[in-house]
Swiss-Prot record:
Name of the protein in its database record: Glutathione peroxidase 1
Family, per entry: Belongs to the glutathione peroxidase family.
Residues at the catalytic site: U52
Assembly: Homotetramer. Interacts with MIEN1.
Cellular component GO terms, alphabetical: cytosol; mitochondrion
Domain of life: Eukaryota
Record site: Subject to oxidation and hydroselenide loss to dehydroalanine: U52
Record PTM text: During periods of oxidative stress, Sec-52 may react with a superoxide radical, irreversibly lose hydroselenide and be converted to dehydroalanine.
Length: 206
């Protein structure tokens, strides 16, 4: 049974209210980073893969957003995942070299935060992604987006709010609350107006 099928009362009793309840270990190793340390920042969270057909497009656009908007308070977070077509089959220690020499290649280096490989769907999903999927069950640009090809579904249980492929995006406000989810087809760079709107808001007096 999907977590989404549990009673609303049970979920309300235990569910975190923001991403600040979660932590993740950086790709380079070391101690887990609490997302609470990013309080007040606008976050763009993506499940990434280094061998996907859109790796070049999305990684370079993630870099561009971080470069342009990072000084104003945007933090881009990438979470490698091998659940979609086995397109992140490298070990954690190999991913940066894959990005540098293969895709995007040409010496590419991500300027945003990358974390260790994790699962985003199923019983072993990283708690952050389980939370994001509950908070935003479908992409705002394509509410029908879901994985429909059985040969690519390698996780269990299968839920309606599952991430459908690499490079789905979650935009999180400066209070840590998820605001919008975008499908893999929505260009990363086209999220810029939504990010700009959040960065332009006056800080809450609460």
């Amino acid at each position: 049974m999907c977590a989404a099928q549990r009673s609303a009362a049970a979920l309300a009793a235990v569910a975190p209210r923001s991403v600040y309840a979660f932590s993740a270990r950086p790709l380079a190793g070391g101690e887990p980073i609490s997302l609470g340390s990013l309080r007040g920042k606008v976050l763009l969270i993506e499940n990434v893969a280094s061998l996907u057909g859109t790796t070049v497009r999305d990684y370079t656009q993630m870099n561009e957003l971080q470069r342009r908007l990072g000084p104003r308070g945007l933090v881009v977070l990438g979470f490698p995942c091998n659940q979609f077509g086995h397109q992140e089959n490298a070990k954690n220690g190999e991913i940066l070299n894959c990005l540098k020499y293969v895709r995007p290649g040409g010496g590419f280096e991500p300027n945003f935060m990358l974390f260790e490989k994790c699962e985003v769907n199923g019983a072993n999903a990283h708690p952050l992604f389980a939370f994001l999927r509950e908070a935003l069950p479908t992409p705002s640009d394509d509410a029908t987006a879901l994985m429909t090809d059985p040969k690519f579904i390698t996780w269990s249980p299968v839920c309606r709010n599952d991430i459908a492929w690499n490079f789905e995006k979650f935009l999180v406000g400066p209070d840590g609350v998820p605001l919008r989810r975008y499908s893999r087809r929505f260009l990363t760079i086209d999220i810029e107006p939504d990010i700009e709107a959040l960065l332009s808001q006056e800080p809450s007096s609460a």
